[in-house]
Amino acid sequence: MRKCNLSSEEQAHYNADLLAYQNKAMRTLGLAYKFIPEDSGNDCAELVNEGNMIFLGIVAISDPIRPDVPEAVQKCQSAGIGVKIVTGDTPGTATEIARQIGLWKPENTDRNRITGVEFAALSDEEALDRVLDLKVMSRARPMDKQRLVQLLQQKGAVVAVTGDGTNDAPALNHAQVGLSMGTGTSVAKEASDITLLDDSFHSIATAVMWGRSLYKNIQRFIVFQLTINVVALASVLLGAFFGTELPLTVTQMLWVNLIMDTFAAMALASIPPSADVMNEKPRKTDDFIITKTMRKNILGVGFCFLAILMTLIVIIKQRPADLVGQALTQFFTIFVMLQFWNLFNASVFGTNHSVFKDSRHALGMLSVAIIILVGQILIVEFGGKVFRTEPMNFMTWVYIIAGTSFVLWIGEIYRWIKRIQKKD
């Protein structure tokens, strides 16, 4: 407007209109014209700089927030992920967009926003002091974005950057995770690690949920697998001290560790993602995958199983020689069934949910459970010398399956108590 024939009062009036539009998250364009001689050799930039233009008015363009963005931002914040807006828009427009998506709160102050020029003027020490508090950076230039990424990384943050333009390439390249838009430039796509085909921020929240759920499923399998291995190893080792023959044969361990565990891995890996993981805080990059809670579960459950199995070994040792084969078959079946029921507990490890809460989850686990149970029955009834088993009668099967199911019910009671305590 400074290039137009406007009085100071008119400029103030239009500037107020501009600010009002920007505070509504609208982008603005000013329109003006001038008459030029036909023989003028000046280019457009020179003609504009000469001034004396006739002002036509302002056009305000609204770019509405996608309906799913506020929810996605809220999910990310609940998950401990800090969201920051870095844009070339004006401070008013950027702040209003942040307010609309739920990022800017009434209690936020100027410490939580900055312009690119102000950010560049800060020393590294001053910028490091403010970088975690920043929510909005307006009028940002490419190097401002890159510097912000580097400062956040110095603070120990894992940084993901979204961008669609060529000027976003430096920040996309320096971030641990660069996310370009499907409609973005080829330069942005080449500098990024992932391209969002739907250009949706919601896809980022969904990807985080899937990633965390997959990580938790891996932890669940580790809990299940290590419990089996600890109990099996200790049973064989202590069984030798008790003076009994090998409690579990090589072929029996082959069934447990290769076949049964393969089906268990399939079941645990196929557990659908849960939105509950988005209420957890991020783990540190150097955290060991086996947590303190996992160690307690493995050792606690393993010790209980081992106590049961050692008691059985003592009983087997007192059996007449002609009944030892049947007793060892029962020992093997009890060992498998303890792990069988523990598989259900492992599937909800890290939550307070009931095994039966999610019908999809319960159906998938039930399918794998049936396969394992049928396999165990076939091995016992027809394994013979290969698996060192003898057929058992129907009631023995009922007693073993029902008796070992206490593992599941104790887990259900424990999780029920935890849910009650959480409500209180």
Locations of the language-model features?
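Hydrophobic alpha-helical transmembrane segments in multi-pass integral membrane proteins
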Residues: I308-L312, I370-K385
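Basic, alpha-helical nucleic-acid-binding regions used in initiation and control of genome expression
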Residues: L172
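Cytosolic catalytic headpieces and adjacent flexible linkers of membrane translocases
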Residues: M1-L151, K155, A169, T183, ...
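Alpha-helical transmembrane segments
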Residues: Q339-L343, V407-R415
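C-terminal membrane-solvent junction of multi-pass transporters and transport-like membrane proteins
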Residues: I290, M294, T351-I371
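Hydrophobic alpha-helical membrane segments
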Residues: M337, N342, G364-I379
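Membrane-embedded transport module
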Residues: I101, K105-V161, A175, G182-T351
